[in-house]
């Protein structure tokens, strides 16, 4: 009898311990379940948005009752913009620059309510402005990544425009494939170009040493880990020279390149007949452009002809800023010496 009671006690004890352990794990798993629920919701929202994007079918958002009548309301469910392709120029006519926000009560977030600018072939334009005013947003609308809420956008066929970001995409392929991207190797062969043609392009961007350094054109590597920041950006310019589009949008794509090499690449691009639209803060690039689109924020912008007196005023302003900074150098040196003395005194 005692033996049976002992067996029952041990068995029940094990069951109770297992139940306690299961309950404990269930309580601790609550945090993981909550995290999974949040991630599932985000993934579902992403997939739903991608399906809507594919079919251009967005749920209409009603205009908020407290929104003033004279304030535009941008709704992805009612896109009124008109896109005209296969033109030989780029023209924005009353195009709002709006950050899309699917499902938000206020619709998109406007950065600029109406942009009007006309870029003919050879009218190289530079886009400047402080952070957050919509410089890159203009390029995204031109590329079709962001919707055209209103107005008219005229532009060439997408094959005639090339976009170069600040950090170019580098695939896990051969060195040759990095230069010809996004074209395939088969398309490269069909074009009739040779490796010597590619070498000439690399010379133009000061990367002629790469084939020897990396082991030839067929070497396959993780190029994003092999190339430096400046080399990556020069590889992006090599792709521009390889494809030779009619228009090129350069979004800070030479920020890690020295000024002299940058100037040579810009000059060569212009010699090829590529119309450049540059997004940058670097005043050294002004001389390669005819137009300046200055986005000032607060729904204001200005289109300046850099061939006129405005260019002189802009350069004079830059020189004034540089002189002001140079005048502060001596004060910075004195402050640095004082800090060194204080540190030396504290250690002693």
Label every model-predicted segment.
Residues 12-60:
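Cytosolic ends of transmembrane helices, especially the final helix of ABC transmembrane type-1 domains
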Residues 47-126, 152-157, 271:
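Primarily ABC-family ATPase nucleotide-binding module
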Residues 118, 171, 189-193, 198-246, ...:
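ABC-fold ATPase nucleotide-binding domain signature/coupling loops
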Residues 121-124, 139-193, 281-288, 297, ...:
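ABC ATPase nucleotide-binding domain signature region
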Residues 128-130:
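The feature captures the beta-strand-to-loop junction immediately N-terminal to the Walker
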Residues 133:
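ATP-binding Walker
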Residues 136:
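Walker A/P-loop
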Residues 140, 178, 217-316, 322:
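ABC-family ATPase nucleotide-binding domain "signature/switch" substructure
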């Amino acid at each position: 009898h005692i033996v049976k009671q002992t067996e029952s006690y041990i068995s029940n004890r094990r069951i109770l311990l297992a139940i306690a352990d299961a309950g404990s794990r269930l309580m601790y798993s609550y945090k993981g379940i909550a995290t999974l629920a949040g991630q599932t919701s985000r993934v579902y929202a992403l997939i739903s948005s991608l399906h809507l994007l594919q079919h251009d079918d967005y749920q209409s958002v009603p205009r908020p009752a407290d929104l003033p009548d004279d304030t535009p309301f941008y709704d992805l469910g009612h896109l009124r913009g008109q896109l005209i392709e296969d033109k030989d120029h780029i023209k924005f006519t009353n195009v709002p620059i709006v950050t899309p926000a699917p499902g938000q009560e206020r619709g998109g977030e406007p950065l600029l309510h109406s942009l009007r600018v006309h870029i003919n072939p050879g009218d190289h334009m530079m886009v400047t402005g402080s952070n957050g005013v919509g410089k890159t947003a203009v390029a995204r609308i031109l590329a079709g990544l962001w919707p055209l809420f209103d107005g008219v956008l005229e532009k060439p066929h997408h094959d005639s425009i090339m976009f170069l970001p600040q950090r170019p995409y580098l695939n896990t392929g051969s060195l040759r494939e990095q230069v010809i991207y996004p074209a395939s190797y088969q398309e490269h062969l069909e074009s009739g170009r040779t490796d010597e043609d590619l070498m000439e392009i690399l010379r133009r961007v000061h990367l002629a040493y790469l084939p020897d350094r990396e082991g030839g054109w067929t070497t396959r590597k993780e190029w994003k880990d092999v190339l430096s920041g400046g080399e990556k950006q020069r590889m992006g310019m090599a792709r521009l020279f390889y494809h030779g589009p009619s228009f090129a949008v350069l979004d800070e794509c030479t920020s890690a390149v020295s000024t002299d090499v940058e100037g040579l690449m810009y000059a060569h691009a212009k010699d090829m007949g590529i119309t450049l639209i540059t997004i940058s803060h670097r005043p050294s690039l002004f001389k390669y452009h005819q137009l300046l689109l200055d986005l000032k924020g607060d729904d204001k912008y200005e289109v300046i002809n850099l061939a006129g007196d405005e260019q002189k005023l802009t350069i004079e302003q830059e020189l004034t800023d540089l002189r002001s900074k140079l005048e502060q150098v001596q004060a910075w040196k004195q402050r640095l010496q004082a800090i060194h003395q204080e540190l030396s005194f504290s250690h002693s």
